[in-house]
């Protein structure tokens, strides 16, 4: 809640009737840069002076209210001014000058008995800011009376400061964009369009945004045989034998690189992200050595933890993983990172800036140089040295010298890696490269005024603050627009220790963002965030806020970040404090749930989807046994236990769906979204009933309209926790028995099932107790199927329908998951998936022009066909018919797609053309024909059989 001066509180508590004045500062179109000019207006009955500025009265006709809620939205406001054609603003508008995108600031002043402005804001000793934003639209209406005097009314539509969030502000891996190139006197020159002056001479993306093909060569020894003869019997005869030998053969392979420009993401915490290739070339004298430069993230990052070569990381997951492939160290429990390759010993430290790492995955030598995106980093010396000697293939092809990659290629603020591949018989193409990145260093502010900026943070508020204040990729808001102590207070709530699990339960601690496996790392909200900078600032801010249940508002002119939280000292409001306009709304029947199914990307599963599923038996009993499932997806949470706690809170919140609306006087000014309220209303039997503020609407006359959301005390981040840390530690190893007898049954012919149904997967349940659901991964699909285990009959098959899938090879991987999140080993099934069979056979398929008494002969030059439409056309859109025509040798003459009609004429001209096509252009016709037809749908639906003639 925005604080106001104690003297203002006393005045407002002792004065029921208030005189308010809105003070408007409207930027004029003549403003430019720092030389902004304004016109100052007020809706008060007389002129008002504030801070030495005169606000003129008599022009402002009306001002609307300003509303904000817990959902990030662009708030709006409108106001009208009126006057004669001689007025300054009216003259400008009537002369065609636009006020669009000009700034506007409105203060709401309280005028005391002495006619002075009451000091309210402790930061300025003046009035509170009512609105700040921009003009986004408007209109003018003229009125000329009988005496010829004309007046005009202008209505301005304004949007608050969140209007500026509706833009994309990311860096593009393109040289022209990076350096701000523009044409000057016919040549490209860097300009102030670069996000930093230093970027103007940074050539790091010079080779990007191009397609490159490289001819790589490598040598292999191939087995050969030669015939060897030997004389026998004094030269009268010979014997022959084959002798094996090896010959060195040079082979060539074309390597295609698409260096298309992309937006550089922002990473906080630890995440796996794909590399963006920005340079590729081979060594001139060693054409099997390929260098590729990949951009990964905005810097400066803490470092790289591991690289994935294709689908395989350099660091082993566990003992089993190390037994099946070439890898090093252990991610599980030990927390090894790629720096082990350079250090030679076990370490959980991230990579070192500029360090070379050597690795061999069994398919050939790989070398990686890591660069963390420092603001002053220098060019990679390994590439500079090669280019200096003209040692690159494309460099020589294009006639370039050392400038091909010299000291100007710094890639400032860009976390990137150089990867050197050796092409050989085991590696004939460049694999996809992705990396586990420990993200951007952020500033963390402390109550004592100190600032730490030496590492990344899992705290969503510090991530949000970094993004909001960045001019390079974020909202570009200056720090002085945030109440810093308020931000610090809210951030501490996210750092409360989660006591629902023990540290040892998180074996992949290093890859969920922890630096060490200590209990103080169990913060209740931990975000590992990727921000797609090709999306708008608005969408990215919204995504972070949703990840920690936060809100941001600027009702008082500051950007105030708040968290949903419980308070033992909420603002207390009695019904008698309101204007009596109370409205209670209850939507509990629609929005309450008794079970939850949530998904997250889990580093313990090689960054594949994991699921959290549980239900509340008490809630289900209240819902009379009906299953009501809440679906959640966590984009920025990768810690299973953080996601589990969040899902539990959201399930509890869903049981509270009552909202309370009413209006209060100006003495409650400063209320903002997410403020805790204790409301008392004797008629309802409420005594300090707990609510959170969901929406605030400040009106011009000082009345404040509120919408409150009911909650219990146990649904918040800072609510009293249930300590599960003393429970048995979940076994890290897989001790959940797998499902049994996994098989696929296609939809039988002639059976009409669900629309587009291919068939059914079925299995017998796991024999492990406490299995709550089954996860089925489907090749080519991101999200798995989730099937709840509601019954415990071990001999009753469980079923998952497969609907609307195209025909072809499909691989299904089935696992059982118990109540603690433990997963069984997978049961895999490869299926040559049939098409979705669910449509009826076409009926009454016939030849219309048959010979009398002989349905096998047609009369006339053409064959006229007809059929009846299938009944499914009434329920399935976009049904069409496929008609195929064959000759006497069963060769297809043509296949025709037919829509919205149920007849087809196979004309004589068609017949002649089809005959000529299959008979080397000879003249003639097909006299014996076979026709067949079936119905099909856009989602893979097909008739279960063909109708034939």
Swiss-Prot record:
The keyword Oxidoreductase does not apply. Ubiquitinated by the Bil antiviral defense system when this protein is expressed in E.coli MG1655 strain expressing the Bil system. Forms the simplified baseplate, together with the p132 collar protein, the baseplate tube protein p140 and distal tail protein pb9. Closes the tail tube and, upon infection, opens to form a channel thereby anchoring the tube to the outer membrane. These changes allow the tape measure protein pb2 to be expelled and phage DNA to be transferred to the host. Also forms the start of the central straight fiber, which is continued with the straight fiber protein pb4. It is found in: Virion. Keywords: Late protein, Ubl conjugation, Viral baseplate protein, Viral tail protein, Virion. It comes from Escherichia phage T5. This is Baseplate hub protein pb3. Homotrimer. Forms a pseudo-hexameric ring. Interacts with distal tail protein pb9 and straight fiber protein pb4. One of its GO terms (cellular component) is virus tail. Its main location: virion. Induction: Expressed in the late phase of the viral replicative cycle.
